[in-house]
Amino acid sequence: ARGVTDATALIGYSLTDETLFPIGLWEQPEGPEGDEWQVPELEVDAEVRAAFKTYKVVGFFADPALWSGTIVKWEADFGSKLRVKGTRDHPIYWWMNRTSLVVRATEQLHTKVSQGQIRITGPTLVRHFRNARRRAGNSGVQIAKAFPDSPDKIDGAAASILAVEAAMQAVAAGVNSKKKSTRLVYS
């Protein structure tokens, strides 16, 4: 059995100033206090709901792999307000197992970061980016941990891929980022 639980990240992206920022990052604590740790789902839900009150959220993509029941509730509450949608039937769903789409979104983020077009804020989010390793596959490059049981988290970087993907879809849909501060979130 794996001894390290993945983190959960809720990452915002400002279309106005092109900045990625952590809204919430939940990681398994080290040592005995990390034994039996689980992501605090109620806390994550509260942060998502607070983000919709605080920001003008135009897109919110989340990998439903472990969150499908919660995402269905978020879709019922917020799906109609989103300008960009993961799919027609599930506006928040964005499966991370769709390799070719993940590769394209990863390349998009990598290009923007390497060209200085996106600012990454928060020490924990920066650490997640530094922990991410390039993994080449048949479809292209994705990110991964250094090894599967690595305690070094990359979930914030993975969440950032979806935040930027939602942002690029918003721009393509004509969301005007100059009038108001427009932010997107991903969990």
At which residue positions do the language-model features occur?
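RNase H-like, metal-dependent nuclease domains and their acidic two-metal-ion catalytic environment used
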Residues: A1-T99, V103, E107, T111, ...
